[in-house]
């Protein structure tokens, strides 16, 4: 018989450096999960992507065990890296803070395809382009 799911928790954590302090501790502690066990497993799984923000979907079962799935980094994080900027614009329609090429947009879309609902690469590119525009990043 399958285990009974008691909770699903979504967290965005820096790859390879999760620790029991907030947000991990409070989010998992209230469900009785062994926090250090999660941190060690997450860090081992994401060590090669160190420094990137990685979303994790944690499924917690009635016996206090857990499983987790890591997703691809958010499009905004990938765009900030590609444009080599610190953060997006506070006024995206007035102030442009960086530039990315169409090739970079396509590369990000290929990486994000597994987590997106887009039917093809062209639709994924349009989605990523929209994210870039809303961050004040110009597409050249």
Curated annotation (Swiss-Prot):
Gene Ontology molecular functions: large ribosomal subunit rRNA binding; structural constituent of ribosome
Keyword annotations of the record: Methylation, Ribonucleoprotein, Ribosomal protein, RNA-binding, rRNA-binding
InterPro entries assigned: Ribosomal_uL11, Ribosomal_uL11_bac-typ, Ribosomal_uL11_C, Ribosomal_uL11_C_sf, Ribosomal_uL11_N, Ribosomal_uL11_N_sf
Domain of life: Bacteria
GO BP, sorted A to Z: translation
Keyword Cell wall biogenesis/degradation: no
Entry keyword annotation includes Signal: no
Gene Ontology CC entries for this record: cytosolic large ribosomal subunit
Reported modifications of this chain: One or more lysine residues are methylated.
NCBIfam families: L11_bact (TIGR01632)
Subunit composition and interactions: Part of the ribosomal stalk of the 50S ribosomal subunit. Interacts with L10 and the large rRNA to form the base of the stalk. L10 forms an elongated spine to which L12 dimers bind in a sequential fashion forming a multimeric L10(L12)X complex.
Protein family according to the UniProt entry: Belongs to the universal ribosomal protein uL11 family.
Function according to Swiss-Prot or TrEMBL: Forms part of the ribosomal stalk which helps the ribosome interact with GTP-bound translation factors.
Annotated protein name in UniProt: Large ribosomal subunit protein uL11
Organism: Solidesulfovibrio magneticus (strain ATCC 700980 / DSM 13731 / RS-1)
Protein's gene: rplK
